[in-house]
Amino acid sequence: MSTANALGDLLSTLLLRRPFKRGGSKEGSISKLCLSLLSEVTEVSGLQLAGVILEKYHELDEKGRLDFFSFLNKDLDIDPDLLVSLAQKYQETQSPEIFKRLSEASEPRRKELFRRLNHAPGATADLVKMREQLLSLLRENPSYARTDFDFIHLLRSWFNRGFLVLRQITWDTSASILEKIVEYEAVHEIKNLEDLRRRVLPKDRRCFAFFHPSMPDDPLIFVEVALTNGVATSIQKVLSESREEIDLQGANSAIFYSISNCQEGLSGISFGNSLIKQVAQDLSREMPHLKTFVTLSPIPGLTKWIKDEGLEKPVEDQGMLKQITAHYLVEAKGKNRRPIDPVAKFHLGNGAIIHQINIDADLSEKGLLQSKGVMVNYLYDLSKISQNVELFSKEGDNSANTTIKALSRQAGRNIMQKGNAKEFSQ
């Protein structure tokens, strides 16, 4: 890996906190303890109090957590009357002192509470878990989104790319981390240890993960890569138990066939963009003969869209299925002119283009249900990523090669001529 990653590993080691036993008095409600922490002026006593609060939080039942989040949301919110008053005074005076008070008043106190809680050993992982539990309550308690806004603002800062450490996952990686890889795999289930071995041990198979120094044994996101001769068109072949390992000198393509986010509490914070680009760059340096970097991606919204558009009959023909899939990926967009397919939205937004559509590429039960077995390759051209990101951001352009665009146009002509479907969603 690169020098930056080596330094990151060193940073990870240096930042590992010494064992610390959380202690101190647990007297008083958790809300009172939080108020005490906010008024604490000495770092040592604040550190212990933060640990006590996190311990107390772990002991809360469902009702206790609801009460705690209600306290954060209401009692530690901004004071709008004070804010308006200070804004008016600042407008009149432009006073630096008023500006300082206005800035302080505009930040909810819960934000400073999260910062102080994070001083305790192991607190970062605790706060990520806390946000995960908060997210589970948002549907029935939409006002808690105010607290979540502050949470995610801080987490984005704490988990910015500069703090992340890229590590390769191998068969020699610690058992605890390998167990988490099995647990977190979200795209293609790892069925047993032998299945895991086939994904990380052979020289033509790689797995890379981002870690954070405060959570050194728990991956944030990981990607699985197959090094192949030619673009892979089927997940069955990639994961085949009987496949033969290839000589790395004969590999010209890197296939990103699975990417899994690991922490629900970090939902909304994107690591995938940086991970794919970093891995592609590192592999390119290690093996200059690798010329093609593509994904082998699911199309989770395809079957539903086909049904909604009344296209079940036409897609019984495989040629039509390929055309209609191309049309879905290129033209099916939401009100914001972004793809309605979440995987397409992710990769196109990261600078990839739609490269190739593969029929019968995922014959698992999940693959057949969500996309009638179709998968797609998104191409990452390292020299054009920035250009593609800009086009997608400004124009919502669903970048695709000429073959895909031709398939999409043909789908429109065929279906409309036969009158077999509603007008395609645009």
Q: What is each stretch, according to the model?
A:
Residues 1-426:
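Extended, composition-driven regions rather than compact fold-specific motifs
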